[in-house]
């Protein structure tokens, strides 16, 4: 009898991860997919020695994609059970199903015919501005969810939005049926911020050494002032670049002996958006812009070099879906001082005049004063 045989137990959570939630290579590079990939790598690299985790995907292709990502991250694939759908999942042996979105109620139907407390269902918010997301939260009131299910909000502002959606529709139901309704059966709404890995690596190097190496790679003069804009390049779903461009041009004009460079690292959704950005840059003098990415998204290595090469991170976001802002956390992880708009999820990360600066969206044309 082999007494040394390893005994394994399952990680309590079964994770649902279709490729749309983490694949930044074959899908548009946006924050929720970056967060999904970080979550995937984080949870699979921190299993206990005796744990195995169940991951649910929707196709063989997604299994292959997941394995490639995890192998590159150095994850032991023997610790992961890849399941296409629920066919091979024993519902009596799981404690939780976690999805990378807020549509919890569509998963409650699989508890039909079982004890309602057989397992919990959890999810996480990303954008909250779409009609589909608002409807999925509205369904919490009339579907099969219970108080032991939970939606994780990544910021205080995100939690407030979810609570307002629930309260509005709760009052609507009370008015319709002319009765007082209990909230005891609603899922728990909690706040847990997103996290990132140590994405700049090379812990044996100082911040200055990393900056020097990356600037050589990117052909940026070592005495430059490099201001980083990281993330989606979109004037409607992130921020309009005009205030940023004008402010950096004003700083460059004010400090002619300082080589001020805006380093854009991200992706455009289409050629039309790219053309508009390029034309705007040409119209503003003096403005120097180096761009990593574009129609083809910046690679992970390019992002790391951008973070390492920069002096300041700046994000004047003013869109209606900035529930968190993972690029701010990435910048902080790279030891960059942050200047951001006083906006939604950013308020949780950046404490004004403590670990960065927050600027009102009505004063973004004066960003150069904070940079200076």
What are the language-model segments listed below?
Residues 60-144:
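Extended catalytic core of nucleotide-activated donor transferases of GT-like folds
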Residues 71-74, 264-266, 274-308, 312:
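Nucleotide-activated donor-binding/catalytic signature segment of Leloir-type glycosyltransferases, i.e.
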Residues 91-92, 298-310, 333, 351, ...:
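Short acidic alpha-helix that forms the nucleotide-activated donor recognition element
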Residues 146-213:
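Donor nucleotide-sugar binding/catalytic pocket of nucleotide-sugar-dependent glycosyltransferases
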Residues 183, 205-226, 253-257:
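Nucleotide-sugar donor-binding and catalytic loop/hinge architecture
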Residues 221-238, 245, 262-264:
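Conserved donor-binding/catalytic core segment of Leloir-type glycosyltransferases
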Residues 305-321, 336:
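Acidic donor-binding loop of glycosyltransferase active sites
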Residues 337-340, 350, 357:
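Short hydrophobic beta-strand element within catalytic cores of glycosyltransferases
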């Amino acid at each position: 009898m082999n007494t040394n045989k390893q005994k394994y137990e399952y990680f309590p959570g079964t994770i649902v991860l279709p490729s749309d939630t983490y694949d930044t290579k074959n899908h548009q590079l946006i924050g929720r997919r970056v967060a999904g990939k970080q979550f995937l790598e984080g949870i699979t690299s921190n299993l206990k020695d005796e744990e195995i985790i169940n991951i649910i995907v929707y196709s063989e292709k997604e299994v292959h994609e997941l394995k490639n990502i995890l192998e590159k991250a150095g994850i032991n694939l023997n610790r992961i059970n890849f399941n296409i759908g629920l066919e091979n999942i024993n519902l009596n042996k799981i404690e939780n199903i976690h999805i990378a979105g807020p549509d919890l109620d569509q998963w409650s139907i699989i508890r039909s015919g079982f004890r309602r407390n057989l397992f919990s269902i959890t999810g996480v918010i990303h954008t909250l501005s779409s009609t589909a997301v608002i409807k999925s939260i509205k369904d919490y009131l009339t579907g099969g969810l219970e108080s032991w299910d939970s939606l994780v909000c990544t910021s205080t502002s995100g939690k407030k939005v979810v609570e307002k959606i629930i309260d509005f529709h709760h009052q609507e139901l009370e008015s319709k049926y002319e009765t007082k309704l209990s909230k005891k059966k609603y899922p728990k709404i909690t706040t847990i911020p997103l996290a990132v890995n140590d994405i700049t690596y090379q812990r044996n190097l100082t911040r200055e050494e990393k900056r020097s190496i990356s600037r050589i790679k990117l052909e940026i003069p070592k005495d430059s002032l490099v201001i980083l804009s990281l993330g989606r390049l979109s004037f409607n779903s992130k921020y309009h670049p005009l205030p940023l461009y004008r402010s950096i041009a004003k700083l460059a004009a004010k400090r002619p002996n300082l080589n001020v460079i805006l380093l854009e690292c991200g992706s455009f959704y289409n050629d039309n958006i790219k053309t508009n950005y390029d034309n705007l840059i040409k119209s503003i003098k003096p403005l120097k812009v180096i761009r990593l990415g574009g129609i083809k998204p910046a690679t992970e290595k390019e992002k790391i070099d951008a973070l390492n090469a920069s002096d300041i991170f700046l994000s004047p976001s003013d869109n209606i879906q900035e529930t968190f802002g993972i690029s701010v956390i990435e910048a902080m992880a790279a030891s960059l001082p942050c200047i951001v708009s006083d906006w939604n999820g950013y308020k949780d990360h950046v404490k004004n005049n403590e670990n960065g600066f927050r600027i009102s969206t009505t004063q973004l044309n004066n960003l150069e004063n904070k940079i200076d």
